[in-house]
């Protein structure tokens, strides 16, 4: 039987990375296995992934050398960042650059980079309908990820740029979930009128 190809998954104990890691581990016929990358290999979530068969390895997006070690011998990687941990476009770009540099160094065959579109392509900085933030962004957590795309392309890393939809878990993480009203009923409100919201569960 052919040896399974290793996919290094950043954010493996988070929503997006965790969903992917479990999907791979639960599909015995996929031909892939998971190297779960996390800053804390002793966390409960890391231990759960290990029980499912993942190789759990310590790595930090702020530490290029740790990423190089973690990517060594892997076929590919799933790269994702968590903007809300620092609220810094500069850090977002620096983290993506470290991932791309490590991927090139390790000779990965393929990378999936979880990114967003650049909102400035649709709402220019000159458009006053939305404020310009930090001097150069309309939606910093979108625009910075889009800027970071070039970290992979300029290094010649074979990359799929994944633009996923909003995921339902965000309603819980960001306090937008159902609220109990005076009558005891749970209400869920999202002021969007008749507009549609594409969404999925991160686990899917």
Predicted regions and their residues:
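Short, conserved active-site loop motifs that form the nucleotide-linked donor/cofactor pocket
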Residues: 53-54, 159
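Cofactor-binding loops of NAD(P)H-dependent oxidoreductases
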Residues: 59
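Oxidoreductase cofactor-interface core, primarily capturing Rossmann-like NAD(P)-dependent enzymes
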Residues: 2-48, 62-72, 76-93, 101-112, ...
